[in-house]
Amino acid sequence: FLTAKIHLPTQNGQIDFAFMEQFIAELEAERIVELEAYLQATGLQDYTLTKEEEKALQGFEGVEFEEFRIEDVLDWQPQKEIDPLKLDNLKDVNQKLYPFYGQATINNGIISYNQLVDEVLNNKEGKSTILIHSNNQNTVYLETPFYLKDGHGATSVLQSEKLNKLNALYFMSSIKKVILSKYSYNAKATKIELKNTLISLPSSQGVPLYAYMEVFIKAVQKLVIKEVVEYADRKIAASREVVTKT
């Protein structure tokens, strides 16, 4: 390691530290501008809590919780799996580009994007969907049609008529809290196991409070994004100050 050589910018035979600092500063400024544009486009710049969201956070300790079997609140969907070695045989350039999911924990489980024949496409209506991979307990949310890597049925595809992005995030949090401590590679979260797994959800008279879950997640998102927005604002202000001085 001590004899390894690395390439660095130089000037007059000396490492050009000033150039490196300026280069990194410019890259950071570009990313901050992109972040600001993204926050504006998605409406995430507004991190002010509504009264309903404040109430959801303040009243969390007083909310009643009940344990539900996953099978009682989410529906298992039939799935079409693909052998990765046969992707070329399934290509159809007339189809739209959709994500191809595996069981990896990186990139949200997406291996690639492909145009394949309609017969192997899952979730054609683009419904809110939760994937749970039994080998590593990885949990993924999606709301697009998708392709699924052959895992011998190791992936559970879950939906519900009441499921949307916000309450799905709450469901996933509750599910992961249980399965990450209960299952492992040697004790897999199989479909039979998952169906009978109990998760804790806010409820009233035995019915999950879907609306409360949505408001609660929205409030938590705003609390998190507030720090991101304030960080971006500070960086943008600092960049403008440097530009003004120069």
Model-predicted segments: where are they?
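Residues within well-ordered beta-strands of beta-sheet-rich folds
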Residues: 5-7, 26, 198-200
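Non-catalytic DNA-recognition/assembly elements of restriction-modification systems
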Residues: 11-109, 205-246
